[in-house]
From Swiss-Prot:
CDD domains attached to this UniProt entry: Sialidase_non-viral
Protein name (record): Vacuolar protein sorting/targeting protein 10
BNR-type repeats, residues: 61-71, 378-387, 438-448, 479-489, 721-731, 816-826, 1104-1114, 1145-1155
Membrane topology: Multi-pass membrane protein
Entry-listed glycosylation sites: 300, 324, 967, 1265
GO biological process: Golgi to endosome transport; Golgi to vacuole transport; protein targeting to vacuole
Alphabetical list of SUPFAM superfamilies matching this protein: Oligoxyloglucan reducing end-specific cellobiohydrolase, Sialidases
Pfam families hit by this protein: Sortilin-Vps10 (PF15902), Sortilin_C (PF15901)
Highest taxon of the lineage: Eukaryota
Source organism of the structure: Neosartorya fischeri (strain ATCC 1020 / DSM 3700 / CBS 544.65 / FGSC A1164 / JCM 1740 / NRRL 181 / WB 181) (Aspergillus fischerianus)
Amino acid sequence: MITRWLLITSFLALAILSLSSAAKKSEPEITPSSFDNEPFSLFYFEDTETILMNTRDGNLFRSFDGGKGWEQVDDPNGKMKKGVRSIWQHPFDKNRAYALGANRRHWVTKDQAKTWESFEVDGYAATQHEPLIFHGWDSSKVIFQSDECMGRFCIVKSYYSTDDFKTVSPLRVSAGGCAWAVGHPQFAEGLNLEDELRDRVLCIVPGLKVPSAHANRLVYSDDFFRSDAEGTELNIQQGRPVSGILSAAAVKKFFVTAAKSQGTNELALYVTLDTKAWHRADFGGHRVEQDGYTLLESTNYSMQVDVLTSPSSNTGILFTSNSNGTYFTRNVEHTNRDRFGHVDFEKIADIQGIVLVNTVKNWDKVGSENEKKVVSSISFDDGRTFQSLKVGDKQLHLHSVTTFANTGRVFSSPAPGLVMGVGNTGDHLKKYSEGSLYVSDDAGVTWRHALDGPFKYEFGDQGSVIMAVSDKGTTDEIQFSIDHGKEWHSTKLQHKIYPKLLTTTPDSTSLTFLLVGSEESSGTKHVVYSIDFRGLHERKCEKDDFEKWAARLNENGEPDCLMGHQQFFNRRKANADCFVDEEFKDPQPIFEPCKCSFEDFECDFNFVRSEDGKSCVPAAPLVPPVGRCQKQTDTFMGPSGWRLIPGNTCTREGGENLDKDVERPCKDVVSAPSHDKLMAQKQVFNDARQFSEQYYYLERQASSSGDDETVIMLTSEGEFWVSHDHGKNWEQPLKGVKIAAIVPHPYYSDGAFLLTRDKQAFWTVDRAYTFKSFEAPIPPNQEGLPVLSFHPQYKDWLIWTGAVDCAHGDCHSDAYFSKNRGENWDLLLRYVGKCEFESRENRPGSEKLIFCQQYENENKKNHLQLLSSENLFSDSHVHFNDAIRYATMSEYIIVASRDPDNPDSLVASVSVDGRTFARAEFPPNVDVPVKTAFTVLDSSTHAVFLHVTVSDVKGAEHGSIIKSNSNGTSYVLSLNAASRNEWGYVDFEKMQGLEGVAVVNIISNVEAVLKKGPTAKKLKTMITHNDGGQWMLLPPPAKDADGKNFGCSVKGGKGSGQCSLHLHGYTERRDPRDTFSSGSAIGLMMGIGNVGAHLSGKDEADTFMTRDGGITWKSVKKGRYMWEYGDSGSVIVIVPELRPTKVLYYSLDEGDNWEPYEFSEVEMHIYRLSTVPSDTSKNFLLWGKEVESNRLATINVDFSGLRKKSCNLVENGQESDDYYLWEPKHPFQEDNCLFGHVEQYHRKKPSSQCWNNWREPHVHSIGRNCTCTRADYECNYNYEPQNDGSCALVPGLPKPDALAVCREDPDRVEYWEPTAYRRIPQTTCAGGLILDHVVSKPCPSKEKEYEKKHGISGTGLFFAIMIPIVAAAGVGYYVYAKWDGKFGQIRLGENAGTYEGLLSRESPIVTVPIAVIAGIVAVIRALPLLAMSLWRSASGYVRLGRNRAYSRPYASRGSFAARRGDYTSVVDDEDELLGVDDAEIDEDDEL
């Protein structure tokens, strides 16, 4: 019995052992699945083994068992098969995912792919923006974004759903997409703003008038733009809106937006915690440039940002913010980046404070011949200090984000403390293919070699299993370790594959891995392996199998503190023969508190770190307790400047208490006193004989940091001077070097080039703080051509046009190209005229487009041809064989060429796309058989004003001003007898900042001056308030500056033939910068002239000004004065012109009162009065010469001390204590309607004792639209204005061919019988008086369509009529303004049947008329072309001398570059169209 029992017992024991042995496997279970198409994207649903996979053919597959079995997903109607373009996982809801279709049908699952529901959106999923934007609090709220494109142009249309796409509603059309304010669950956490932020949406929308990136605005709505289609603009900086918004993104508890102004690459980053209070991020004086920053993985209490410092070497600086994202501290320099902005930076998962970073060791030597030497380092204290990675005593370097070969995190996973990477030991990082696999199980403190060669790797079962697969070509085996990478085992695969992806569940708690690869044999078969390690251990880990592991250790090997606590994990011991086997249960950290220390505190709001980083100093004056600080020597108890970092859990007892109040000196609270007087500072130039005309302001743009006001200038002796404080102090950085010319960078206001008379030249890109020299290939040209041409987008791209063979009788010019600011040069063309880059925003693919004039067959006796090329003239296209001159302005290229039918006459041809040109046709009632000269004046109101010379007889030069329709193809007469000078320049000037206001001088005695004899011109000044539709004389003021009556008077506020105000215009100015108006001082104009029957001589002139855009005028001073505006018009300075003085006058109330100020102890002749081009400074600079000593001097006059505070602007309200709403108006209209709408501007009240302190372009809004009146129309083609204001057909001319539109557009259904009128291009009026469309008729053979069309509803009829009209007109820029005003803003939800689509104001058709090629006349302010030019071209004669030829000094601010001088710089030779085309941002002046 006992024996039998022993036998049975032994048998059972053997059986149990056998079963145990069978259960414990040595290899994982591998299950392959084959697919005909490559897996495109896949992801796990969190806390499940459910996988969703999209293949490249558009099919969708799912697996519920970790990839062992797959099934194709389809909907009942079969639409999902081959219909899924991309899949998206909801980042905040583990149950939801989205499958976006290739068409307009999409799908959503709310149960982890078990079931799917379809939904439709009227648009394709966006490709340039995120197609889905998720709400951080409510997973049922999603924004869907689509790209609607025409050709290469796309706009972003956003839709929203609040119920998981059961319903979808249009949100709005935008320029940069929309986002939920709550973009992350942590946003506004604990702020009790749930009701306020629940539905808030932020969108990047275009400027009110300008569809360019630098005008984009950030607006929000709390009701999906239902109640207000425009939305509310966010006050981002100092309580005011910011333009130039490029991007906006949620980063955990932060919301960040970036803005960039025109004329700079510097970005301003703004951060908010609630979308209400915004702060500009301060990087300690470091610039953040466009495409030069990367938001990195951030913590709950700070942001990490890497800022590009060297584009050539792709290196940066890593910054870490304080808890509110306002102040950033520099952590690591020379971080390694790639050209896409990826940075070698990663935090170790789930462990606070450990960061791996790669830096460039030889950052200062990286170039074309020197490769980067990348080294790796690690921080255990949140980036405060870094140390090397070590394998024993050797340094280890690992490949990081920029060379990552898998998906997910690079080094770590939620497996506590386990870190892996591919790299090498030695001096620096080698190629990825030369690397090996290394592992650390103490969070990077120590490392060991794991496997030879590069591998893809993953962690499973909280680190109990590590799997790797070779990443060096093909393989048929995998490697795995179950002891933290100390020992490795291999297992064969069924196929030999190219591994593409190795992954597992996101929390790394599963024992199943997924390997995706392509078979080596076929290359078209794709395999997905499910690799299950469950059988390798037979038991589950118990308590004794775990250890308490400290996540961070200090330099002494002790647990370290961060954010007030130490962090520990219970993790499986490396040698434990068990699996944790707790799927989807993340390792939980254990926190133990620490005593508060220095590291637990940060600078409080309005405090910044001191230079040594050991204290916090006030960033703004402190407010002392009431009754304290009566004297500066007093003290008071105030804030220390420190605060405990929010979220920090340190124990205060026994620790540091840095945030307790401290005794502070009262000097910390006393701001710079308002001394109630001006400050003048004179600088004398003893060795200089004269100032040259070359002086330039390198003005900071709105997004630029810093506060210097830099001026650079030349003396007549070629001495170069720089001032960084607006002329208070000057220095000579290139003393001893004779500079011949200063060439400011027209697209980059921080840069300038200095040229000598030989090949030596200099550049600065940091606002003249430093200069670097370069050698040009040849000396500057001697033909009056621009020496340098600049690329609008790439600031380092240059074209140099220099002189060749001038000492040997064949003097000509050659053009060279440089991509690196003159370091290297390549020959473009020989025997050239002007060469320019023609890249523009509205010309996609034009980055390399260059235009050049070249003498045919490289012989100067031949004609100048106009060529273009997109490959540096490896090949080229000839556009014109006899191009006299060409110029570019805004989106247009205009060419003056010889008329083939009349060689003595000029013709103009225009292109928008830079590839196809068409001739511009002039109106028949301007009968000039031989067009010897014409001048293109302006196009800022989306129509071209052109002056056609009628007479070029010396002393009788004049012509007719004609105005184009919106696409430049049809011109009508606007005004006759406009005066010009012998050089072709016209007394015509647009008022900056206001639509449609222009001033011109006409000759009242044309017939007399045309007769032989000494009769002089009698000029009268006229003004238009509706863009040339109507002109009137300037109304004279009632009294002069002394309160006396003038010799004549008028009634009713109108000027008369015998009594009106006349102003000296552009052609009489000593300095072309002295324009009447300013782009920032809205409504203000100043000028010198007289009241009477006509304009008298300058010696009889007085000084006048207007505050209402030219409606009324007042005399401010007897005599001639120069003027300048400051602080956007809140201060005006005038100084006598060319007579000895030591006194200037200033007004702080828009000219109501004038105060004298003695700026010099001795009398001076003042030649020039200047300030920054935007007129936003409170500093002014006088340039002159002392009368007695004859010494040159500059005097800075500083007004900043006169007032203490900044004005308070309530942008979204109506008015405030400091501002009122001002509406421009027409003098003979009662409703303030101009161009079909009422514009409103915030203007400072003259009585307000404050400063504007704002550098942004002037903010304005469209208050309302108006019904149409006669003022919204102008005379049609072949019609001319009559004395009673009506339009009549020119005698002998036919009516316009109405049927032409039908012939040109075969799909057109109807046409309109021509009338005498057409709409002014920029009007936005709706309804009311209809003068241009009275009778419609069907196009031939379109009778049925016509009948069908006119049977539709009123709204549909409106669209059916207007859309063809808009298309026929060429879809120019005016449509942008027209449709914007008519509908206010896109109301996508109002009527799905009349959805504006591509005809909305943001539409590329409307804003970018790239398809319009024919007949658009150039947007050039001054383009004089004289008959002499033809003769010179034929004879080969070129005049080299210069008279008043100089570059325009105000080449600094993008949005204000055109406000000073409606003519760009020109050389004195009249055969030059434009000398410096720096005003090509003309259309962008006003946002």
